[in-house]
Amino acid sequence: MLSGLVTALRTLTALPVPGRDAERFSSSLYWFPVVGLVIGGIVVLLARAGMGVGWPELAAVLALLGGLILTRGLHADGLADLADGFFGGRTREAALRIMKDPNVGSFGSLALIGVMLFKWICLLELARAEAYGMIAAGAVLSRTAQVLLAARMPYARSDGGTAMAFVEDAGWPHLLVASISGVVLLFVLLDWQLAPSLILLFGSVVALFFVGWLSHRKIGGITGDVLGACSELVEAAVWLLAALWLKGLFWAIA
């Protein structure tokens, strides 16, 4: 069972991890929320380092860049490829072909710049409030969302791909275990506060369904790039709602 954790850490992070990979890569999906917690914990440490010198802007930059370096930019690359393929390809085949191109186009560049700036602004607000649990929650929920997408949508490429080994055997057991783990970790990180936990969970679900709907419409399934983009967009959505919660917007609406 721990071999699944090894595979999950090697897949989602650049951390040097000893041990053997799982025989079935899909077994690593059970561990995605836990790896999200590891990533979130490291990102939080970087944010705390920036706040330790009283510099929220530095804290947000360290958290953002640290997350990118820790994940080798894997999810960000998926976001760029998704934007290029979905908005640059007029047909399913064209979209899949563009997504496989290692070069980043104009749509991909715009998506990366926009989402990274957006995340930096949210992280700045969260760092100022020292809402470290909410920062980590974004990392946990975004990796949990990847499992849900992999378990409920077919793989789009007939010629295989890097994510096919994870998606082809994914099913309800992976979805249920990851969902329960992700929700429990969310509540723990937010000190069992019901209202903010439900709001962040709502944001992650909306972003997840949006990515799933768009991917189904454009290519009829998912790829590794879609899973990476899902992680980036869910994380951004969670951090946005966390920042809005801290600014009291939901109380103002109520």
Swiss-Prot record:
Superkingdom of the source species: Bacteria
Subcellular location: Cell inner membrane
Membrane topology: Multi-pass membrane protein
BP term (GO), one: cobalamin biosynthetic process
EC number in record: 2.7.8.26
A UniProt-annotated Pfam family: CobS
Catalysed reactions, semicolon-separated: alpha-ribazole + adenosylcob(III)inamide-GDP = adenosylcob(III)alamin + GMP + H(+); alpha-ribazole 5'-phosphate + adenosylcob(III)inamide-GDP = adenosylcob(III)alamin 5'-phosphate + GMP + H(+)
Its biological purpose: Joins adenosylcobinamide-GDP and alpha-ribazole to generate adenosylcobalamin (Ado-cobalamin). Also synthesizes adenosylcobalamin 5'-phosphate from adenosylcobinamide-GDP and alpha-ribazole 5'-phosphate.
Protein name: Adenosylcobinamide-GDP ribazoletransferase
Record organism: Chlorobaculum tepidum (strain ATCC 49652 / DSM 12025 / NBRC 103806 / TLS)
